[in-house]
């Protein structure tokens, strides 16, 4: 997570360097891509971490993709240990985590273009069908903070 955090935090400097080497539009597109990819990297890292921790705790191996579904992953831990994700995150953090995971899904599988299924699944009122998800630096950093907090909590489970 530290590498992803440093990358996200240094995007302005990278954009300046890339602008010197290429042009402003190319630099902007490259930095936007890195920022969008950070969502995927964080979610993928969390999925694998949660799968491994769950197996360590329960002896049961679940599909790694089960842990990109926030409620499902939380339920696995709750059923096994009595503590779901809500034991470690506030309700607001859980809501944001679910939203970020949904945004990552639409970025990965629909090139960031919002469809009705995304709106129905996420409840995201910031976008309409046909618009493109825009990842903000503060959102990427927020997702990292939430995942670090949740991962620390999961590490306390036995």
Summary of predicted features, one role per range:
Residues 1-122, 129-158:
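Amphipathic alpha-helical interface elements
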């Amino acid at each position: 997570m530290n590498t992803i955090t440093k990358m996200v935090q240094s995007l302005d400097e990278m954009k300046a360097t890339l602008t010197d080497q290429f042009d402003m539009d190319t630099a902007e597109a490259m930095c936007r891509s890195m920022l969008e990819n950070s969502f995927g990297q964080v979610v993928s890292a969390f999925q694998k971490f949660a799968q491994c921790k769950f197996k360590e705790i329960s002896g049961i191996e679940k599909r790694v993709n089960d842990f990109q579904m926030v409620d499902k992953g939380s339920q696995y831990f709750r059923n096994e240990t009595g503590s779901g994700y809500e034991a470690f995150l506030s309700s607001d953090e859980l809501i944001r985590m679910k939203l970020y995971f949904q945004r990552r899904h639409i970025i990965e599988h629909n090139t960031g273009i919002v469809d009705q299924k995304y709106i129905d699944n996420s409840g995201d009122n910031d976008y309409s069908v046909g618009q493109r998800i825009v990842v903000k630096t503060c959102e990427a950093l927020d997702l990292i903070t939430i995942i670090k907090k949740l991962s620390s909590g999961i590490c306390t489970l036995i």
